[in-house]
UniProtKB/Swiss-Prot annotation:
Gene of this entry: purM
GO molecular function: ATP binding; phosphoribosylamine-glycine ligase activity; phosphoribosylformylglycinamidine cyclo-ligase activity
Swiss-Prot/TrEMBL keywords: ATP-binding, Cytoplasm, Ligase, Nucleotide-binding, Purine biosynthesis
Organism: Desulfatibacillum aliphaticivorans
Key word Transferase present: no
Identification of the protein by name: Phosphoribosylformylglycinamidine cyclo-ligase
Length: 347
């Protein structure tokens, strides 16, 4: 008589998944926030929205992943920071619209569930939530045999925040004479990794544990540097400075992202050489013989967030960033745009 088949025979271990949920419950407790109702394990995450401090509350949401930075984490077998990247990619997108992060959910899919790897990933997600001051209220971990190679996985994140309708930062107030304040990134963040991997691993033939003198660390360490979460920076900026627009510099670089917060009637003039480039960018540019505009449209090149502010408040903003221990630079200004002008002009 043929053996009776089980879900485990098909490659899905429900008991292992349940053990992971128990571990995650402990991790989630480290991300408390007013408004969270209950814990995880239910059919949905519950959040009680207190709107008393808002005249016209608006929920702001975003979803994103980490891209092929995951491949570097897998190559290094180091998974405890990739969750920070996941939170950063979605949270930074709602921060630049003036929203205060409320809660976050994650989706993790693996070919074969590895409890320790999954727990490390969720620990990173929780750390990202703590940095962003938002609650991790739920998620999904899917074991999907036949969909991924052994050891491979994918991540997606979902952030929800709140803003007052009349305080939403949408770029509508951006105008001629405004100044571009660039706030430093920590490195690659989570974009451009397909090209970065091409340079380091294919073109140069390096390994994740190869030490590079110009970088002062191994390739893997430089590439896995977590994405900066700008929650505290943005909170202080919009409290003290009249911020007319903000852009999270991700895929597409300054070229594609800054115009998203600038009216069609305006252009941004970027002053080349006005900020400090982390070592990884000039190294890749030289090693891969990458064109300057290709660099600018692929990577953040050292600027992870741009705030558009009134010229009279520039010094105050720079002093605020310095007091927070953050690197910030005046990288350009806003000017009137002619009929045939590009949205971005480099000088």
């Amino acid at each position: 008589m043929a053996k009776s088949l089980s879900y485990a025979d098909a490659g899905v271990d429900i008991d292992k998944a349940n053990r992971l949920v128990d571990r995650i419950k402990t991790i989630v407790k480290s991300t408390p926030r007013q408004g969270v109702i209950g814990g995880i394990g239910g059919f949905g995450g519950l959040f009680s929205l207190n709107t008393e401090q808002y005249e016209r509350p608006v929920l702001v949401s975003s979803t994103d992943g980490v891209g092929t930075k995951l491949r570097v984490a897998i190559m290094m077998d180091k998974h405890d920071t990739i969750g920070i990247d996941l939170v950063a990619m979605s949270v930074n997108d709602i921060l630049v619209q003036g929203a205060k992060p409320l809660f976050f959910l994650d989706y993790l899919s693996m070919g074969k569930l590895n409890e320790n790897t999954a727990a490390d990933i969720i620990e990173g997600v929780a750390e990202g939530c703590r940095q962003a001051n938002c609650a991790l209220i739920g998620g999904e971990t899917a074991e999907m045999p036949g969909m991924y190679e052994d050891g491979d996985y994918d991540l997606a994140g979902f952030a929800v925040g709140i803003a007052d309708n009349f305080k939403i930062v949408d770029g509508s107030d951006v105008g001629q004479g405004n100044v571009l304040l660039g706030i430093a990134s920590t490195g690659l963040h989570s974009n451009g990794y397909s090209l970065a991997r091409k340079v380091f691993f294919d073109h140069l033939g390096l390994k994740v544990d190869s030490y590079v003198e110009d970088l002062g660390m191994t390739v893997g360490e430089a590439m896995l540097e977590p994405t900066k979460i700008y929650a505290e920076i943005v909170r202080n900026l919009i409290r003290d400075i009249h911020v007319n627009g903000m852009a999270h510099i991700t895929g597409g670089g300054i070229i594609d992202n800054l115009p998203r917060t600038i009216p069609q009637s305006c252009k941004a003039i970027i002053r080349e050489g006005s900020w400090e480039y982390p070592a990884i960018f000039p190294f890749m540019k030289k090693a891969g013989d990458i064109d300057e505009m290709e660099m600018m449209r692929t990577f953040n090149n050292g600027i992870g967030l741009v705030a558009v502010i009134p010229e009279p408040q520039v010094q105050e903003a720079l002093e605020l960033m310095q007091a927070m221990g953050e690197k910030a630079y005046v990288i350009g200004e806003i000017a009137a745009r002619g009929e045939n002008d590009d949205r971005i002009e480099w000088k």
